[in-house]
Amino acid sequence: MDTKRLIRRVAAMLTMGLGIATGGQAIEVPEPNAVMVNESSFRCIREMVPVRHFYIDNLLGNMPGALEAANAPNGAVYPPGTVVQLVPTEAMVKREQGFNPATGDWEFFELEVSESGSKIRTRGFADVNNRFGKNCFACHVPAREPWDFICESGHGCEAIPIDHSMTGALQRSDPRCGTPEPQSGDTVALFKLRALILIGMMVDWVKGIF
């Protein structure tokens, strides 16, 4: 057997071996600048950096850039890897440039949180809804420019049915953080929030009937 034929046979054997080892699936190699997001990307919200009434993080370590954008008085584009959360169960993550221009490269997440960590319930771009049935992308579109889709007072976004007392209570009771840090009024705020969620579920149920 000549050398070239031997090399071809060895290469074929190696290829078959890789196919068996990977279940026949091609090995996905991430892009060099890709922002990898999985359930471990999300942590106790109070371990993130507070900015006014929300929290931010950066999966690529670029916190200076994220903070600069968050505090820019006239708005700015957030750097890739930025995580923005108002409540523990919802998040926005800035993906790599060009990943989804329609959403400004933001990916939206609905999370399930517990003492054991975070579980991604839903993720995507223009098709993710929050627990009130509101579409995340549609809510944030009015703040496209110059705020890079970040909703705050005066950014043009439609008002949400919860106030800062409710979001603060949720932040302080994030089960991923261990012992809650309740403040006066948190119990009432959480009760009102649960009532709003139940009302929303009832409305959806009635709509489903008719």
Set out the residue ranges of the language-model regions.
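Bacterial N-terminal signal peptides that target proteins for export
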Residues: D2-A11
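A general structural-boundary detector
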Residues: M13, E68, R123-A126
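N-terminal post-signal-peptidase region of extra-cytosolic proteins
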Residues: L60-N74
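Sequence context surrounding c-type heme c attachment/ligation sites in exported
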Residues: I27-H53, G75-F210
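Sec/Tat signal peptide C-region and signal peptidase I cleavage site
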Residues: T22-A26
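Compact soluble domain cores
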Residues: P50-P64
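Helix-centric, low-specificity signal for extended rod-like, repetitive segments
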Residues: M1-D2, T187
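Bacterial N-terminal signal peptides
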Residues: A11-A21
